[in-house]
Amino acid sequence: MDGLMSSADEILDIVDENDRVVGQARRGDAYARGLRHRCVFVWARDPEGRVFVHRRTATKLVFPAPYDMFVGGVVGAGESYDDAALREAEEELGASGLPRPEFLFKFLYDDGAGRTWWSAVYEVRVAGAVSPQVEEVAWHGFLPEAELEGRLGEWEFVPDGLSAYARLRAWRGASGPGSVG
């Protein structure tokens, strides 16, 4: 592998139901054994307010090939949620110099089938061009949120992204005027 670490070998903090670190494990082992870890979800919008939507590549370790309305990923061992949000947004969007994503809320994702992670949701405005990683993104576009809503019943989306999106919509409703949106 030319000295490069695969995503399955990345070291993650393993956390408990209160998001306290209780150990570390390789990413591949964390997924295989259903170990709770940390992830970030970044709601990326352009200056017109359109949402960055993309289709994941078929080679992704988790949820290969569906669409997602967030960029993001796992939080590395010892990494903060805030640092991971910026790193993942810049990596997946292929855009450097982004403003630091704004933290919105955090929730525990659990699909009931062994996939569980603490999920921090952020928002970032993307003013410049994007050039997503071809290893991560098979297709992308900025869609008006109304179009995204229409695609929810047509396209297959990642389940954790759908969960984060439902919570984002509820959070915006609870936050009132001036909230994200």
Swiss-Prot record:
UniProt key word Disulfide bond: no
Chain location of the short sequence motif Nudix box per the record: 72-94
Keywords (A to Z) from UniProt: Hydrolase, Magnesium, Metal-binding
Nudix hydrolase domain span: 35-175
InterPro entries: NUDIX_hydrolase-like_dom_sf (IPR015797), NUDIX_hydrolase_CS (IPR020084), NUDIX_hydrolase_dom (IPR000086), NUDIX_hydrolase_YfcD_pred (IPR024195)
GO molecular function annotation: hydrolase activity, acting on acid anhydrides; metal ion binding
Cofactor(s) essential for the protein: Mg(2+)
EC number: 3.6.-.-
Pfam family, one: NUDIX
Protein family: Belongs to the Nudix hydrolase family.
Protein name: Uncharacterized Nudix hydrolase SCO1686
Lineage: Bacteria, Bacillati, Actinomycetota, Actinomycetes, Kitasatosporales
